[in-house]
Amino acid sequence: AAPARPWLFPLVCLVLLGLGLCGTLLHLGQPLRFVNGMANPASGISQESYWVIALGIVIVVDLVLSWRGKTVRAVRWVGGAVAVGFMVVTGLAYFDCLGLVAWRGAATLPVFILGDVALGAGLCAVLAKADDWAASLLCPATVAAQAAWGVAIVAFGLYLQRSGLDATALLA
C-alpha cells in the first residue's frame, strides 16, 4: 500500500534544509560573510552551497512528484547520493579549515557523515508506516548509525585530548 502522505518526507527534508541554511548564516557570525565566502568558488562554503542547491532541487522534484501522487524511487536514490556528497563536502570544509586545529583530526569526516546518517535514519523511522517492509529495518539501522556516531565522537574526543586541544569554545 502506498503511504497516505508521500509528500511529507520531502517536505520535512526541504524545511530542515532551509533551517540548516538559516543556521549557516548565524553560524558565520555575520550573514554577509556568506557572500564573501561565495566570492571564492573553491572555498568550503561555496562547495557546500553548490551541493545544497543540487540537493534542494532534487528535494523539490521529489516533493512535486509526491504531491501529484507519484513517487519515483530513482529521485530518492539521486537525492541520497547528493546528500552523501553534501555530507562529505561539509566534513571536508571543516577538516580543511586552517583556523580551527581541532577539526583537523581523522574523526572529523566520520563525525559529520555518521551524525547525518543517524539523524536521517531516525527521520525515516519516524515517518515510516508501521506496516512498511523497511520500517522493521529502520529501528536497528538507526541504533547502529547512532552507535557508530558515538564511536566517532569518542574518537574525536580522544584526538582532542591527545593533541592537547580544548574544544569547549566550539560548543558556544
Regions found by a protein language model. Name each.
Residues 2-58:
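Membrane helical hairpin/interfacial module
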Residues 42, 58-172:
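Long, contiguous internal "core" modules enriched in hydrophobic/ aromatic residues
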